[in-house]
């Protein structure tokens, strides 16, 4: 496959973003090498807190959470999904599938050999991150899900349907504008520009374009069976599993119910509702960091 790489200068001087880039090369099943970017801040001898973003953002979404957690002494790892941020971007929309995303991030996880992970995942960060939990449950010590799900082809919310229609039909995908529309506060011009930074033009956005159409919302969608198999693993996951959905997200409202009903790790832990929109990391970063700090403090020492 043909691959685009956003020039480094696009990421210079971004607001509140001083983290050094780290890169891992993974190989697709077709032999194509793909470079995946991640942030790795804080003491390397601490258990990693893994922050996974979704559509159409990148690790920048977690910049305030990262700073808060590092100040509390934690190690924080935040990757960019393939097609986003500083990670490579396959050039064709058809290069992107749900299963390829899972395979790419599985290879990334294994190459970096992360263990004893505390995962926070939102949006597609959950659709992919929870598949990683199901594939490598021994690598994860705790999970926090926020404004996400693991769909098995049983329908969609009105909010998601509106987003799907917009994303597939708009002539240009205005990423910074989309991020601003999904937060309770107004992002600054500099913040919106940072979300636009990974995409010099529309040709870099094929991964962002196709993501909404890859969500398994009908029985005929690809990955329904794979997600059902992942649910079977999650139904045995008895380590701490916290729901932290926001109070103003029309896309995933009520999505915590399935986790609470099916994942044994949701018992005997405190759940929370965060204030904010779909991109709750922009609205409640201090609260997210405090939640993760408290969760880690309650885990047995590795």
Curated annotation (Swiss-Prot):
Highest taxon of the lineage: Bacteria
UniProt keyword annotation of Hydrolase present: yes
Documented EC number(s): 3.8.1.5
Entry annotated with the keyword Hydrolase: yes
Catalyzed reactions per annotation: 1-haloalkane + H2O = a halide anion + a primary alcohol + H(+)
Pfam families: Abhydrolase_1
Domain AB hydrolase-1: 48-152
Residues at the active site: 123 (nucleophile), 249 (proton donor), 278 (proton acceptor)
SUPFAM superfamilies: alpha/beta-Hydrolases (SSF53474)
Keywords from the named record: Hydrolase
Family: Belongs to the haloalkane dehalogenase family. Type 1 subfamily.
Subunit structure comment from the entry: Monomer.
HAMAP family tied to this protein: Haloalk_dehal_type1
Record-linked PANTHER family: AB HYDROLASE-1 DOMAIN-CONTAINING PROTEIN, HYDROLASE-RELATED
Function according to Swiss-Prot or TrEMBL: Catalyzes hydrolytic cleavage of carbon-halogen bonds in halogenated aliphatic compounds, leading to the formation of the corresponding primary alcohols, halide ions and protons.
Protein's UniProt name: Haloalkane dehalogenase
Organism: Caulobacter vibrioides (strain ATCC 19089 / CIP 103742 / CB 15)
Lineage: Bacteria, Pseudomonadati, Pseudomonadota, Alphaproteobacteria, Caulobacterales
